[in-house]
């Protein structure tokens, strides 16, 4: 069992030396957001028609996702401080895969909305942890450089989402478009499992106490 009182310099060193892998992981984790929203958009008219749903219901699949994504990060931060980044990442990406499968197989619009809400919660865990990893491993200047490289990868992912989503929807149907999110998440999960060690040097056993939660909330709100 890892001590909560001792830093973990060996793990930090391995991660720092493998900057290329860290950049790739960051790009994929941050890329979950445009993949989950932009790739989904071309499929929205088809799935709305397929379910015989209203446009209001269709828009709710996006609204619920984004609300869950935003609010869940208030809790994922303290949880990752208490348990570490790796458990939160693995748990988050696992839930994302399950929710993405549920979206692709959804029998009706209500099930899709529920699955998209869960997907937003899972996406919040992954995106929050990605930003925290940079703070764990690098000084501000070096961290900005690493994040800049990751954002370049994110931009590439974002640019391909709408064309890929449109192609899959037109040629294979909206369920296949949503299934591509499962593949993206599985690849990301495999890389996390194989190549990502814990980046947090010291766990915080008090992270879930009311005082710590309030401090974290104020910090997040101040950056909005």
What are these regions (language model features)?
Residues 52, 84, 105-111, 122, ...:
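Helix-breaking motifs and short loop linkers at transmembrane-helix boundaries and internal kinks
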Residues 115-156:
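Cytoplasmic helix-loop-helix junction between adjacent transmembrane helices
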Residues 107, 111, 148-194:
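Helix-loop-helix hairpin linking two adjacent transmembrane segments in secondary transporters
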Residues 38, 66-74, 158-159:
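Residue-level signature of mid-helix packing/kink "hotspots" within the transmembrane helices
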Residues 9-15, 201-224:
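Juxtamembrane intracellular "pre-TM" segments in multi-pass secondary transporters
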Residues 71-110:
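Conserved MFS/SLC helix-loop-helix module at the cytosolic interface between two early adjacent transmembrane helices
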Residues 21-55, 76:
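Extracytoplasmic
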Residues 1-33:
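Cytosolic juxtamembrane N-terminal segment immediately preceding the first transmembrane helix
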């Amino acid at each position: 069992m890892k001590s909560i009182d001792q830093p973990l310099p060996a793990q930090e060193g391995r991660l720092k030396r493998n900057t290329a892998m860290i950049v790739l992981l960051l790009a994929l984790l941050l890329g979950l957001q445009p993949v989950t929203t932009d790739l989904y958009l071309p499929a929205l008219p088809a799935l709305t028609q397929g379910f015989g749903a209203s446009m209001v219901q269709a828009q709710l699949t996006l609204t619920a996702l984004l609300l869950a994504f935003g609010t869940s990060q208030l809790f994922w931060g303290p949880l990752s401080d208490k348990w570490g980044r790796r458990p939160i990442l693995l748990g988050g990406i696992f839930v994302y895969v399950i929710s993405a499968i549920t979206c692709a197989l959804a029998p009706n619009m209500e099930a899709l909305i529920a699955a998209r809400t869960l997907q937003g919660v899972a996406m919040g865990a992954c995106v929050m942890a990605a930003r925290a990893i940079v703070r764990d491993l690098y000084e501000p200047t070096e961290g900005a450089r690493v994040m800049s490289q990751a954002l370049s990868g994110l931009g590439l992912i974002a640019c391909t989402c709408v064309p890929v989503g449109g192609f899959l929807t037109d040629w294979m149907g909206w369920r296949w478009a949503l299934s591509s999110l499962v593949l993206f998440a599985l690849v990301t999960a495999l890389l996390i499992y194989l190549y990502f060690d814990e980046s947090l040097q010291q766990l915080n056993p008090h992270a879930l106490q009311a005082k710590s939660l309030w401090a974290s909330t104020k910090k997040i709100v101040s950056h909005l």
